[in-house]
Amino acid sequence: MSESRAAGSGAAPAGWLAWFCILASAIVSFVGLRYVVEYRLPSTPAGVAFPFVATVGHLSSVTIMVLAIAWLPCRLLPPLRSLARPLTILSAASWLTLLVMDSIVFAQHRFHIDPFTAALFDASTWSLGAVLLLVFGALFVVLSANASRLAGTRSATSRRVLIAVPLVLLLLGHAMHAWADDRNDGRVTSYARSLPFKYPLTAKRYLARAGWVDPETARKARLERRVGDDD
């Protein structure tokens, strides 16, 4: 009995973080679907699948990274341990606020927020951001309570499987982009520009050396697609 309690108390903070990351990633991925809505989906299966795979994989992975960066230093420094959850919740709310604001800017102007564009925001835009931060802060406080409940009732295996899904989708998205980029298939690669902080993988030289892609064949296929689009 004492051993199980010790194990449970030691795993509780990590369990909370894992479930909080899972819940936050689900919210962020849902909001990120706006980038897919604003994108004109091509007719090919890969062209349709890639935006969804890339959006969920990329935004969920960024979410996990942001929350881990906020949580880990506080947990490693005993004087700051009481701040771990509040700072993680604040980081989640800030990241979601930034994403919503970026999606609004991208839908209107087709570029993402950076320090230069943020400097051009007027008072009403900053006010909107402040309201969103408060709303999302309250949302993530509720999700934090749910994460605590899930950490106490769900198995470690379930959270490990769920936390691995975004990472698998991230790798799959990079693999799809690298393959499409090698084949000069803009119907897939063009969506990567729609996501903020997205730096997709390219591997033309490696795949060509491995014999998986023939550059000349890929070039001809791209020309044929252009002719077909013009017709």
What are these regions, as identified by a protein language model?
Residues 2-207:
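Transmembrane and membrane-interface helices of multi-pass
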Residues 197-231:
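Soluble catalytic regions of membrane-associated enzymes that act on cell-envelope
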